[in-house]
Every structure is written in structure tokens, then in C-alpha cells.
Amino acid sequence: MHGCGELFVRRIFAQRQFSLFESVGEQAEPDELFRTVRDPNPEVGAETLKMACELAERLEYPIVFVNDPDADRLAMCERIEGKWKFFTGNEMAMIYLAARIETMFTTSSGVGDPKCLDDDSNSNISNIFYSTVSTMFPKTICQFLNIEHRVKVSETLTGFKYLGEKVLEAQLRGERTLLAFEESLGFLVSDHVYDKDGVSACLAFAELANTIYTRASTFNAYLTQLQEKYGYHLTFNKYYKVQDMSKVIPLMDRIRDWRNRELSNDSTRSLEDYPAYLGSISSSPSPPSSDDQYKVTGVRDLTVGFDSNYEDNKPRLPISENNQMITFYCGSKFVLTIRASGTEPKLKFYLEKVLPGTIFTDGTFASYESAIGVLRDEALDIMDGLLEPKKNQLLPGF
């Protein structure tokens, strides 16, 4: 996308003899003005990928890959029944991980002896690393297949400086990494690279496409198959623009001191200091039992160094007083993280809810869009309760 990636993607595709490859001529060369798009960020989706999709339609190609200008991220979309499906970073990670894990650890009769994909690796231990605001799918699939003793799943703070460091540490232990990723379309698919790389990721997904399409399937069909098997990992990640940055710390402090206990320096922080429930009922002393799905069962606050998920209440991830970040757990299948951006005047939130794979066949939802719509409504209700956007002049970036 008006950057450095096209030359290298074309080169590696030629080496792998992928002949059905065409690039958008108007966007193939570096252009610091990004003349053909309003925003070269591939996360924007349809608008940014429009020219590539139009070219694919003319050529009758079903898949589009797009790198951002510095080619460290990869976006992907697929034409399904005449419409383009834009995959999120979480969905792409699910597809790639499941394909690798199921190839390594499953047979037609179920879980079997691992079949190593990497001929040059003697490691018996594999790793998956992901940022703490990305999907929990790696944990889900490893628990489902009972391979946690062979595949270690680890969270890091946001940023590939943390993910890359973990990949290097694993390599020094003689262990392989299956994938390191962030929800924002950042992927590290090789032990030979210690940062997100859209070029090697593009090759990896192209090779996977070759395998999937050879089986007369599609990325979207495979994703649906995974969700029906392992559960629908629905996510809603958005942000509020902050007009007055001086309000950020008081807003986050209000959440962590919800009970107005006025902790002193020698006081012991506990789960009771935070909201007991999420949503518009968060301030109610006796929420209705029907809202138990929003009952907070755990909190991790990396700003003050608190994590109720451990007996000592100490987080295992690094803490920083300069980074505002709180995560709420409502059971094991509902997670919300709120954090202040370190580079922009934004308060970001990341919500994930895991639902059974039968939600469409049992009539719970009529469509995937309706399920996401309900999640969106839940997210906005929760944010209204915690952040009071109108009162605090927070502008929704969605």
C-alpha cells in the first residue's frame, strides 16, 4: 500500500511459484502522500482495500492481501458469494493457528502424536504469544485439544518489542514459536524474525490459501468450522477520543476506586475496590440475578500492580504507573480491557465474549452480524457505566 512491501512479496511469491498474483499498479510504488487512499492503515477495511478488491473482481481472484506502507502488517479479505469478507486480526490468527495446530496434533481419529511442521527443529515444545488485548482463542484450542503440556500460551503487553523478546527467549531455550500476534493485524510467523512482518505473513497465508482451496474450501468456511467446533470468539474493539487528556487518570482512578474506599499507601487493594458488575447496573448495590453474566470475577490492573487471578494479587505482566490499563474478567468467557493509548488522545477498549458453537443452529442469533450487534450494544452499555462518555466529553471513534 504505497510502500516497500510489493517488491519483496512479488519476489517470494515468484520463488514459491505462485503465478496467480497481481498487484495494484497505482499503489505498488512508495508514495509518502498515499494519494489513492484517505488512510493507508489496513485496519480501516473496505475503503482502504477498495482498489485491490476491484482488481481482484476483474481478474476473478477470490483473495486480497494488503500490507501497510512499511509492510509490517497484513490485512486479508475474501470474496464470498459476491461480497467481500474483511477478516480481523483476531480472525486471521485463529485461522492460521488452528491450521498449524490441527496439522501437528490431530489425526482423523482425534488427538494423536504430534507431526512436526518444521523439519529443522528438534524442539518438543511449541509457543504461542499474543498481546493481552488480543483474542483468547489460543488458550481455547489448546485446552480443547488437551495439548497444554506441548504448546505453551503466553500473554504479553501490547507491542512487538514484548512479543519479539518472548520469541527470542523461546528460541534460546530450544523451543519453536507457532505464532506471535496482535489483534491489530501484526503477525510474526517465523523464528527467524523478531518483529511483526507483513511480508512473511503474506507468504504464510498464501500457502495456507493454497491448501484450503485445494480442499474445495475457503478461509471463511474454515473459520466458521473452527467457531462451531471451538466456540464463537466475538470481539468488539473500539476507542473514544479524549478532548481533555487531564481527565484520563481521574477516569481510570474512578474505576479502580469504585467503592470510594480511599486507599492509603499501606492499604491492601482487593477485588472489592472495583465494580462488582459491568454495564449500566454497575452502580447498583443489588443487581438482578439475570445479569450474572456481567458479574466481575477477576480484575487485573497493570497501572497499580494488582491481579486478583493470583493468590498473591500480583500481576505476572510488567506494571507501569505511566500506562493506564485495567482488565475485567466475567467468568472465563467474557473479558474487557480498557487502556489509554500511549501515542494518541484515545481511550481504547477491547471486549471479547466466547459463545457456544451452536448459537446459529439453536436460534440464539439469526446471523453473525446480529451477534456482533448485540455485543456492540453490550459494550456501549458497559462503557456508559464505567466512563460516562457524554459527561466526560469522550467522542466515540466508531
Residue ranges of predicted features:
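Well-ordered alpha-helical segments embedded in enzymatic catalytic cores
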Residues: 47-51, 92, 96, 162
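Gly/Ser/Thr-rich active-site loops/lids in small-molecule metabolic enzymes
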Residues: 20-23, 83-102, 200-204
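Glycine-rich, mobile lid/loop segments that gate access to catalytic sites or pores
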Residues: 1-4, 133
